[in-house]
């Protein structure tokens, strides 16, 4: 078959040597060439076939490994991954480590081999359980490098390692950072307090406040109660009761000492409590009382979602002035991204449509534009800026804004601007 193919390619019809004429001096050479080419092509075809089979086997192994990994069957997944090739095997290993299954050496080896893979922050954080089992301070600190622990267990391990090396100030700083920002189970809390109990006495209220803002950490909050003052205990109980819509919420809120009534976290829980009860006028009154400054809000980003909800409700109810004040008083920065952009848009929209104040609207639409980067959002910002400038009588400015918006023809507002 190969001889016939080569014959067609070269313009020769190769036949068996025994049938060649005896006086054809080239027959022997041609036959040798044909045999050599036949052997070469046979080898190439065989190699390609084997590679195809190997790829097929690797793909099948990887599919089996991924299916087992999804089911949490890591024994089967790792065994199947052995036939998935180097890259396929590492994909399964990556998943295994991100599930917190490996030993410290497994994490160290993978991070050294793949320092630029996606999802490494989570992988490294999951490895903190393994780090905590190490008794080598240098190895523990080398694992974290310039990064800070992301778990309570990891923070305890770093504090222990720093103390073992005599780096007491760094140990105290990490203990405070971890205690006030991270989640701890009961065992890790006890371990951290055993290491840095005196230093952390001043941080208990900060930690409890953060736990209450986060929500969903009731067990941690309850463990913190004996470590804080009676006033803070009353405040924490009221905040937890309000968040859970407890029947005792009103009673516990009334029991909060006068000195604690201005707590931003308490104001936030009272606000969301009223929103869930559809008490929108009461909610508006409360949020406007605390929107004059960032400290009064405590955590402006936590308020943002419910704030935007209230703006839309007040707008539909025809309460434009209150809607604008709620939107504009967010106290967010551009760093908050989508929440900042949403509230700036709402403030601008209400100012333009209901307050008939196009200059005020332009200010908010400019703020909106500085906080966005996608074609849809940029087109929306420039379109509404154009509408506001148009209402203000600035035809040239409006045209320029519409032209900018019209650049984005895949966006709804880009198409509107083009009209």
Predicted segments, located by residue:
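Bacterial N-terminal signal peptides
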Residues: 40-49
């Amino acid at each position: 078959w190969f001889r016939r193919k080569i014959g067609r390619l070269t313009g020769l019809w190769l036949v068996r040597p025994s049938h060649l004429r005896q006086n054809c001096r080239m027959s022997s050479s041609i036959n040798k060439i044909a045999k050599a080419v036949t052997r070469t092509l046979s080898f190439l075809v065989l190699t390609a076939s084997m590679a195809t089979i190997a790829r097929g086997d690797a793909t099948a192994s990887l599919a089996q490994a991924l299916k087992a990994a999804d089911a949490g069957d890591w024994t089967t997944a790792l065994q199947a991954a052995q036939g998935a090739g180097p890259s396929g095997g590492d994909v399964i290993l990556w998943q295994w480590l991100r599930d917190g299954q490996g030993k410290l050496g497994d994490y160290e080896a993978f991070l050294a081999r793949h320092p630029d893979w996606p999802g490494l922050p989570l992988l490294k954080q999951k490895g903190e359980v393994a780090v905590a089992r190490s008794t080598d301070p240098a190895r523990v600190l080398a694992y974290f490098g310039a990064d800070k622990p992301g778990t309570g267990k990891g923070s305890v391990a770093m504090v222990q390692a720093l103390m073992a090396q005599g780096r007491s100030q760094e140990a105290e700083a990490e203990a405070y950072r971890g205690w006030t920002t991270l989640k701890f189970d009961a065992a890790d809390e006890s371990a951290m307090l055993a290491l840095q109990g005196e230093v952390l006495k001043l941080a208990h209220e900060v930690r409890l406040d953060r736990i209450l803002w986060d929500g969903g950490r009731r067990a941690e909050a309850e463990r913190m109660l004996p470590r804080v003052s009676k006033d803070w205990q009353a405040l924490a109980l009221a905040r937890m009761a309000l968040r859970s819509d407890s029947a005792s919420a009103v009673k516990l809120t009334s029991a909060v000492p006068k000195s604690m009534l201005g707590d931003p976290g308490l104001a936030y829980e009272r606000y969301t409590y009223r929103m869930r009860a559809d008490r929108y006028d009461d909610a508006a009154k409360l949020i406007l009382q605390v929107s004059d400054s960032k400290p009064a809000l405590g955590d402006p980003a936590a308020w943002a979602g419910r704030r935007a909800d209230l703006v839309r409700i007040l707008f539909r109810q025809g309460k434009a002035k209150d809607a604008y004040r709620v939107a504009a008083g967010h106290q967010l920065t551009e760093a908050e991204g989508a929440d900042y952009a949403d509230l700036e848009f709402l403030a601008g929209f209400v100012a333009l449509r209901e307050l008939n104040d196009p200059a005020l609207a332009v200010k908010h639409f400019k703020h909106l534009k500085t906080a966005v980067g996608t074609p849809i959002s940029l087109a929306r910002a420039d379109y509404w800026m154009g509408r506001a400038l148009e209402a203000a009588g600035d035809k040239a400015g409006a045209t320029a804004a519409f032209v900018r918006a019209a650049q984005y023809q895949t966006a709804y507002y880009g198409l509107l601007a083009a009209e």
